[in-house]
From Swiss-Prot:
Superkingdom in the source lineage: Eukaryota
Name listed for the protein in its UniProt record: Forkhead box protein N2
Gene name, Swiss-Prot/TrEMBL: foxn2
Gene source species: Xenopus tropicalis (Western clawed frog)
Region Disordered: start-end pairs: 1-52, 83-108
Subcellular location: Nucleus
Organism classification: Eukaryota, Metazoa, Chordata, Craniata, Vertebrata
Database matches in Pfam families: Forkhead
Keyword DNA-binding set for record: yes
Keywords: DNA-binding, Nucleus, Transcription, Transcription regulation
PROSITE patterns to which the protein is assigned, alphabetical: FORK_HEAD_1, FORK_HEAD_2, FORK_HEAD_3
């Protein structure tokens, strides 16, 4: 019995020593392993305060990363808000957020097609232009459209015909032989166009890059004077030649108007009923448009009729199958 009791303390003494060795090895390994290993062993008895300090440091790093979010929010202050005058084709490009000095002559202008048309019409002496003269004004002021896809002309025509800000007017008696139609700005919606024009990116840099003006000019800019607003825009619009702009923005000769008459698709589209000078050509063009519209409607009706017949056939088959199944079920019951 004596040796038995003597061995018991020895085992008790050796057992803690055996437990301390793995414990020390665990703490040494934890100091060298990444912090994820320490987080995966929450029940370890020998975890020191250094590991918790490292974890807190990581949390502080995450807290400091909010400065990056602040930088992103500060960098987005210069982006203008959306406007109903921004049509589909007139989306703001990245170059639209730059200052006027950084805008190159070949960069995309930060204006919608509605505003481009408005500026072109207001710069003309008679405040009305045909479609081809609007093209010429845009090409003179913005060389970007000289190499842009030709679809921008379709966008101009669509804005003229479908936009409520513009209306078709009758040619004066001095231009009896002229073809096509003239377009002007509806006075009812002119204040909306002026307000949208002042919200463009150039307005924020207007006070920095324009020559000092008198208080009267500042008050006139806030009024509903379309001419003053348009002239402010011209200070930042890239031009190929400013000297010849005044003479080229009026009415062109009759020969020039006849050459580009085919491009004036809106001249006789009939969106606004106005007296016409040449009824024969208008009748021919109107008949052609009506025939094309009728052809499209006939094709759509044929497709719809075919779909209805197909659905009717499916419904008939389903009804016959239901009747057959019902008759068979009644026979089985009998």
């Amino acid at each position: 019995m004596g040796p038995v009791t003597g061995m018991t303390p020895d085992k008790n003494i050796e057992t803690p020593a055996a437990e301390k060795v793995p414990g020390l090895s665990q703490t040494e390994n934890m100091g060298s392993l990444p912090e994820e290993v320490g987080a995966a062993r929450p029940k370890a008895s020998m975890v020191d305060s250094g590991t918790t300090d490292e974890e807190l440091t990581n949390l502080n790093w995450l807290h400091e990363s909010t400065n990056l979010l602040n930088n992103f929010s500060l960098g987005s202050e210069g982006v203008p808000t959306g406007s109903p005058l921004y049509d589909i084709e007139g989306d703001l490009s990245p170059s639209g957020c730059q200052t006027p000095e950084k805008l190159s002559a070949s960069s995309k202008p930060p204006y919608s097609f509605s505003l481009l048309i408005y500026m072109a019409i207001e710069h003309s002496p008679n405040k009305c232009l045909p479609v081809k003269d609007i093209y010429s004004w845009i090409l003179d002021r913005f060389p970007y459209f000289a190499t842009a896809p030709t679809g921008w002309k379709n966008s101009v025509r669509h804005n003229l015909s479908l936009n409520k800000y513009f209306q078709k007017v009758e040619r004066s008696h001095g231009k009896v032989n002229g073809k096509g139609s003239l377009w002007c700005v509806d006075p009812e919606y002119k204040p909306s166009l002026i307000q949208a024009l002042k919200k463009q990116p150039f307005s924020s840099a207007l006070a920095l890059y324009t020559p000092p003006t008198s208080p009267t000019s500042v008050s006139s800019r806030s009024s509903v004077s379309s001419l003053s607003s348009v002239e402010e825009v011209y200070e930042f619009i890239p031009k190929n030649s400013r000297a010849g702009s005044d003479g080229s923005e009026g009415f062109h000769s009759e020969d020039d108007t006849d050459i580009d008459y085919e491009e004036d698709m809106l001249g006789d589209s009939g969106y606004v009923s106005q007296p016409c000078i040449n009824p024969s050509s208008n009748d021919l063009h109107g008949n052609k448009l009506r025939k094309e519209a009728c052809q499209d409607i006939d094709d759509e009706l044929k497709e719809a009729a075919g779909s209805l017949l197909h659905l009717a056939g499916i419904r008939t088959c389903l009804d016959s199958l239901l009747k057959t199944a019902k008759a068979q079920s009644q026979k089985h019951r009998k």
